[in-house]
Amino acid sequence: MADHPMTERLDDLQKRKEAALHAGPERAVQRQHDKGKMLARERIDYFLDPGSFHELDMLARHRAHESGIVERPYTDGVITGWGTVEGRKVFVYSQDFTVFGGALGEVFAEKIHKVMDLALSVGAPMIGLNDGAGARIQEGVVSLDGYGGIFWRNVQSSGVIPQ
């Protein structure tokens, strides 16, 4: 008897989530560790209370099909979500250097914008764990626009929430 279509879809979703947990290639992971650096998820796990992290947009991938970027790893190079520090809710993003050198592209920026907006809307601290190469030049001006959105949100949050 064949699996139920829903079971197949849930299995596919689980495989995608597992792939997202290990988005960067093994050689990039090894280079980070050889430099004594933690990976993006390791930094989040180290910073937040154990088991408190809730990830947002884990399966997001870039849309820059015309840019020549063939690889489309999940997370698009940034992990976003919320958790707690000593029981207090905080929002966090952590750039993943193993995916495109942690360079900011359009979807990457949208994920940061979203988590920053959520932090501001609930009055919770916003934590950025940065380890990136700057703008993803292959995506052109949309990368720079992404930085503009981050800076604008920094200004809007200034004096309102810790960041």
Report each predicted region and the residues it spans.
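Terminal-region recognition feature
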Residues: 1-163
